[in-house]
Every structure is written in C-alpha cells, then in structure tokens.
Amino acid sequence: MTVVLFATEYDTPNIVVNMLSETPTEHHLFPLMIKYKPSNRIEFVLQTQRCPDSTRVRPVFICDARRLSLSEYVSTNTPLPARVICAGIDADATRELYEHLFDRKKDETGHDEENGSAARHLFSNLTSTLKCLVHYNRSAILRYLNNTFLSPTFPSWFLSTYGTHEGTLILTMSYYLFERTYSTIQTTRDYTKCFTADPGRNLFTYINMRDFMATMNGSRFRKQTVLFAVFAKARNARDRCELEYVDAKINAFREESRLAADSCVYYVYLAYRTALCREKFLQYCEHTAYDKNLPDDQQCAAEENYLGRSLDAELISIMNTYFSVEGYFGSYIHVDRAKLSPPHSYRGYDWNTEADTMVGYSSTATNLAISLRKLNSTCESLFSPLPPTLMGLLKLCASDRYVPRAEKSRKRTSGGREKEDETRVCRRNYLLNDTSRPIGPMPVFRVEMPEKRHVFCAVSAENWTRRLLPKDLMKNLPSEYVSDECLTDAVWLREDIAALCEVGEQLYRTRHEMFNENLPVFNFVGDVDLKLREDLQGLSRQEVFDLCRALRRTLIGAWRHLFPEVDPDSHPVFFFKSACPQNAAGAADEAMLYGGGGYDEDDDPRPEHAAAMVDYGDAVRRPPFCVCRRKLGLRVIIPFPPRTAAIGAQTLKRLAGILDHTLCLDRDLVCKLNAISHPGECFDTGIYSHGRSIRMPLMYKLDEASGLILHSRLNPIFIVPAGYRDRPAEFVLQQLCPQNLTHHGRPPQRDGSADQLTEVVLHITDRACADSDGNFLQSRARRAMSSGRLPLGPLLRAHLSLESGQSAPSLPTLVGRGGGGEGGASSDYEEERAVGSDEEEDDDDVENLQAFARRIAWPALLRHTRNHYREEVQQQLEAATVFTAVGRTCVAVKRGLYGRARDFSCLARETYTRQETVQVFLDIRGDQRRNVWATLWSRCFTRRCNSNAKQTHLSLKISLPSQY
C-alpha cells in the first residue's frame, strides 16, 4: 500500500469529516511525505499524539488508487481537492477505521420481529452506509480526531519540530514517522548529521502550505530516505549496544563495591558524564558516521564499545585503584608524622584507675560556671582566666600551665638545716582542692542522670576495677585459649537495672568521655553503626563473631599500611557490642547476656525438659545470639602504635573516613556486611569534635520514656590476636582496662616514663579528596560540576565595577568542559583545586562578596520578593543591613536594630510566637555564562520547619549590566 502524510491549511478534522460524509468543501489536501508501495490501497495518515509501540502515524481515510490518480497531482505539485478525494474514498476500508465509534443499536430480543421485518431491513441498509454513519456520529468522530492526531496547519510547525534544513527535515520525518523504531525526533535529527555532511539549504518559514509541499516533493533527499533508514537502524542498534555495555560496566562496579546511597548517586553521575560527555560523544559520532565506501551491513561497526572503553580508561580504572587496598594506600593516603624530642608538653590522662579513694570534681552546667568564675578569681594573678563554660573545663583539664611553689620538707640535711623542695601546682589543684602533688591532665565525663539531667565530672583518681569488674575475674578466665566465643562466655559482668541519683554511682553506669582537642589521642575509638536489613531475623553467635573477626582482619590491615611498625599478629583491636533491646523477640539463653538481662527461669514458658535441653548442642534450635532490629551498634577501639599519638580532630575524622572506606575493599567482609546491613558509612565522625562525647564501653543507655531503666550496655566481645593466644587472660585485662578505652588515655603496658611520646601524627591526607569533609566521589563530582565556571572573585569585581560606572576588568577565559578531563590519571587528584575553581579567599574577595550582596544582590531580591511574600516578611527583609561573609560563597544576613544585629522570624510560616531566631543566608555563585546566581535560604529552629533544616526560598540570576 501507499502511505501519504498530508496536511491542510484549515481545520483538518472538520475537513476529513466533511469528506467522509460526502459533503466536501473547497479546501485542499497537501501531500508532504509519500511512501510508495505497489497497491490499489492509498492510506492518508496523520501524526498521532501518542506513539504506542513506536506507531507514530495512523490512517484517517483510505482511497482506491483506481479512482484517485495520486501521481498526477504529485508530479505537478498540485494539492488534492477535497472533492477529488471524496470521490476516491474506499468506504468499506475507511469504515473499519471508525467502527468502534458507530452506535449500532439492536432490539433487546436480538432479532427482527415478523411484522415490519422487511421495512426494518431496508432502513438498516440505508443507514449503515459510511455517509450516514458519519453524519449521525459526527461529534464522536471529531472528538476522536482531535484527541488522537496532530493536525498542524502551518509549515513553521514542521520546521521547528523536525529541522530547518532541507535534508534534516525530510530524512527525519521519513524515518521517525514511517519506520517503527525506538527513537526520538532529536536523536533522528542527530543521525542525519552523521549521515550527510551537507544537510541542504536552510528553509525559511513558508507563508503557505503549497510552496512547502513543492519543496518537500521536489527535494533531492527524497531518494536517500531508504538508505538513511538502513543507516539509522544500524546506528540505533549500535547506540543500544554501546549504552548496554556502559550500563553493564557501571553496574558491575556498583555491585562489587559497598557504596552508600548518596555515593552511589555521585558514582552514577560521574560514570555517565565521563562516558557520554560532549567531547567523547562527538568522537563516537565520527567513528559511527556514514561511510559510502562500506556496504550497508558494515555501517556503524568500527571500534566496538568505544564509549565503554573510554569509561574503563578514565574512570573505572581509577575507581579500581581507589577501591583496592594496595592502590588506595599506595597512591592516595599520606600520613604526616613528626618526631618529638623531650621535653615536650604532649601528655595523656594523668588518671589513676586503681586508687583507694576517688578524687574528682562534678557539677551541673550551671554550677560549673559558678565554680570556674570563682577559680578565675582565686588564680587571677597566676593564670589567665578561663571561660565559665564546659569548654573552659576542658581547657583546664588539658592545660600544661604550672606555677612553682616552694615548700619545706620535714627531713633535715646532715648539717641540720631544712631543705627546700620545688613543687608545681596548677589550676587543677585548686579545682580539686588538693595540693599534695602536681595533677596532670584529667578526663572529663558526661554522666546521664535520671529525669534527663546531665552532670560533668573531671576525675583524677578512682577504682575502676573494684566498681565494674567481678572480684573473681582472674579465677574464671581460662589459662589456655580455646576460642573467642568461649573466652567471651567466661567473662560475666555484674548487671544493673535502674539508674541512681548519686553521681558517684551513676558514673559507673552512664559515663560518656568528652573529646578534648587540646590533648593527644592515644586510642582510636570508633563508633560503628550498621543499619540492619528489615528482613533480618537475628544473627547467630557464629555470624556475630565471624563479623568481628573479619572487621579485625580488615582494620588491622589498614593500620599496618598507615603504621608499618605495627605487628598484625599482636596489635590489639577491642570490640564491644551494644546489647539487644530488652523486648526483642527470641531473646533467651546466651542472648540474655547481650540482651540486657531480664530473664528469669521461673518465667520461662517452655516445659522443663525443653528448657533443660538448651545447653545440649543442636537438640533444639537455639534462639538468635543477636536480635537487634534497627541497627547493630559496635564500639571498635584500636590503640595507636607505642610512643605514637594523633593530634587534632580533623586527623581523627579523616582516619575514620579511611577506615570506613577500607571496609569496602575486603570482598569477604563486604559479603558479610551486605548480607545483614544496608550500604552506608559505618563510622560516626561527629564524635571527633571538641566537646562531643561518646559512651564508654561497659556503660548503659538511659531509657528516655521512664528516665530510670538502663539498657543497651556495651558488652565486650574478645577477638584475640594470634600473638596473645598463649596468654588470653592478659588480653582480657587489656580490653577491660579504662586507659585503653578512652581517646586520650595512655595505655599502661607502655613504659612508664613521663615523656614516653616520641612521635605524633599531624595529618592524614586522602589525595583524592580535596575537601576534608567530602569523600572521593563527592570531591570528584564537585570538580566536574565546577569545570567551566569563572572564578567568583573576578566575576564579582566586574559586576561591582560596572555598577559603579567604571569599566569592567577583563575576565579570565572559561575552562572547557570535558568528560575525561575531570579525572584522567590519578595524579589529577593530587591538585587541591581544579583549574578555574575559586581561589583561596583573601580580604579583597571577602569585601567584594559582602559589597556585592549588599549593593547588587539584595536589592534585586527585594524587588522580586515584594510580589511573593507577606508584608511582615518584606518588612524584615528590607530592614537587613548587616552582611557578613561566612564562607567563600555564603553571606550571613542580619537586621540592624538599635545598633545591634538581630536575626529574623520565620520567613516561610506564620508562628504563634514570633521568635527572632531564624538565620538567613545569601549564597552567591557564578556560572560559565558570566552570570551570578543569588540564592536566599534560611534555617528555622521550629519543628514545623524541620528543626534547623535548610530551606531555600528563591534563586535569582544577575547578569552583567552590559547584557541587559
């Protein structure tokens, strides 16, 4: 059959209905695209609004070629009159197109009655003709045509949709409309560029459809439609193979690695950007362009998997290096260590944990301020004042400031004269009211008390062993190592159920160590949380211990790469597991030890013989060892090598990030983790900030509902290294020693000299992460997104100069956008900043940022907000006078009131109490088109605004004045 795509200059559905009802008007039909095939059937088609199964045209009527001389009109570029079409319509074939719309009613009986049957039959024949059916169902047919088909009446629609060049227009229309393939118009237009270098003349907008029809029917590209269809299908198949290969490469790496959800998004973005960037895709188009010297079956076959191989070379290979142990530590991790020569002031806790009596200080936050003010007054002439806050207490407990004090000893020399000894005192002596000896740095603990109260304690001496460990601990420990499980079972700790109001007692139930950035860190204390899968029905004893052993193997391997002097067979890694919830199902037997207690044999509902059988192997199915549901909480502690400590919170945060990434590099560990938990960062880095606290091992949580019940104790799990297998009791004592369980405690097994520290870790750098707060994928994505941007400083200077009437300074050239360019070799990551990114801010940049926000960005935002915000909000915004830079691209905005800077009330919602606690910011960034984007956002502390979550209100583009 022959298919004719036509158009009209008026309402096409009405013209078609008039022809079907044999009441043609004087309108004409313009055949634009014809697909010939020897047949007596000519289908006149229109483009559909929807294309199920890639069917993009459907017939609206069918003509008989014996009654319609189509070639006569086409050869002379003459439009088809409606009356000629009407005479050539095949009524039977056309009727089938609209059969579903015709309303053909019958009697309820389903057959003709005897009386009047002949008349009924005659009437049925007269009304069942196409003419009559269209007449009686005109509204339904018009509705169908309007809802199903596109019926443009101007040539400009075809030019804007399919292309303005002659070749692009005809080849795209013929392939997209007549070839049922999965392709879009834009993709087909791109195929035409690869098919021919000469797309023909540029077609201007035609005034009438007749000239447009003549141009299309007389084009030389009509002869190339068949050849182009063959090429486009081959190219389409090649594109599909390329994308499937790229998808397979991306998914293969994603499935092998344990990427968190946000990291996975960054990875997918980077992968597709690398493989399908503009430069790579243009090169791919050159390799798959039409070659007239090749046969049709060899078109688009050169260099298979071109995009996938570029992805391998420019991203996957780098990812494989970064996600392998040797490549990661060998190419990306650098540890900056410094030697110390005595005397130096780096000291850990001077903390006696085996004293007969407790020496310390405890206070609430309110009383702490009073005590520190009193201490400042007492030591005013000796020491600089401390801030009367918790930060002041931390500074006091870490201070190395001493003053000499002369006192006479009671012993006399051989000459009978008294001998004067020089002793030293510090502010800690005054705080503890003890001047008998110099008191060194002390730990500061936060203790949770009943009724949601907190007490802060500074402890110099206590008896940890007597208060927390059983008296017969050494008697119950085996002399020979059997297994980690047996050794863990041999240690039974005393259980507590309820909290007490005495601080001295509660200190041994809910103690939290506070991180003190003024002290060196001797032990890496890791807070590990594994988000468990919802379908997990508990973990067996074997699974929990195997997981801990795998964690030790992976972490000690990373420790060995960071500190080569570490012996992996003897260096300890201490594990503590948070006890399971008390109401978890199936908590019994040995799970009671780790389920927080609460088990009573008298309350066991099982028969006596069944309960007795629990201890006999596999006689009955044991309940799970761990019945945690939401997360599995672990405390993992790794001491630094002897005579080595780390300095600074950022060092600990980066170290936690490195260990977190290391967990993704061990295939065996990844399999274990994926089976029980969701991917994501395991180590909490928020605990390594000055003044933040972390619950110590052997301590409980306090129930929020009651404020009295203790639960989720951190119980020990002993994973004995090979070097301690001959003396397991010594390892147990080390794991229960408090000096090994705190950030700043000095392990007692090292030599007892005061200045034992000989080396400190200053920085640990991941060369792939220029931003210390971001990971590898985030840093790479930021560099990819910032490529092509102008530096913000020169851009702001240009805006300010033009705003003040001066000539704008010359702007630096734009950096080209490349796909592989953002990350070719691994050496690219050694640069801290990408070319073209913002430089380090100086005073001029800060002043320019504040001036731009005050003089240009804020007035532009005010003009926009007048029509979109409430009057009281607008009044607040117009009162803003203080603009302070808080980052390279961020400005804090405050109102000026009576000479003071004030925050705002809520900008998004009306609140009952209009508290002025909302922080407002202006984010200012440039783009590659030399525009500046100003974004207004705020943080509101109310729950209705998601408790301090970032709320973006509006973004505004500010162009250079010369572009207005």
UniProtKB/Swiss-Prot annotation:
The keyword Zinc applies. GO terms for molecular function: DNA-directed RNA polymerase activity; zinc ion binding. The record marks 527, 529 as: Essential for primase activity. Keywords: DNA replication, Host nucleus, Metal-binding, Transferase, Zinc, Zinc-finger. Its EC number is 2.7.7.-. The keyword Membrane does not apply. It is found in: Host nucleus. InterPro entries: HSV_PRIM. This is DNA primase. It comes from Murid herpesvirus 1 (strain Smith) (MuHV-1). The gene is UL70.
